[in-house]
Amino acid sequence: MAGISSRIFIQATVETGEGEASVTIQDAHTHIVRITENGRTVLEEPGLAGSPEDAGEATPLIHRYTLAQLREYALTVPAGEIAFIRRAFEMNLALCQAGLDSPKTTYARYLLAENGGQLISRDERATASLLCNGAIEARVLGLPQPAMSITGSGAHGIIATMPLYAAYRVQGYPEEKLLRAAALSYLVCMYIKEYSGKLSAFCGWAIAAGTGAACGLVLLRDG
């Protein structure tokens, strides 16, 4: 995957009876480099530079470490330095609850019934499925509740954290252990995403975030 490029170029033009406008996006999904209106340039910006892709030889910072080193960091970093991760669980849990409270969702309420009508049951797998899919359904429906993202994706952020939260609640693990597992989950997700880039032929939240969550679950279980 090292040769995969995430370079983006999108040009959209709209023509109406009153005129024509064109917008060009380059290098990143939100980076507008040119806007024209009736042939007149109203905005022009340079492309992005300085990424590892542009440099052609620079190694992403996270790839300077091995997976063993990332695991060691997650196990030994002072707990206070990763306490901010707690906010991810709070935010994504609130998103899931918003989905359950909304009449727009269907799958979340189905999974709630499958979990015995409880947000947290004694079934770790059913609880994880509810927390993940409930939050994701709320997100894709556009409910007015934020998701804590990782690598620029809300779905990645949900998958990287909520299975760990389910295990933590069902099995009664200490909170510090949860935070360390989440730190590893995030790092592994970032590690994989630096290989696949912004655009890839596979689903990033299934592969990158899913692998991160799996590593975090192993860490929770003293693996």
Task: Report the location of each language-model feature.
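Conserved structured core elements
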Residues: 86, 122, 126, 158, ...
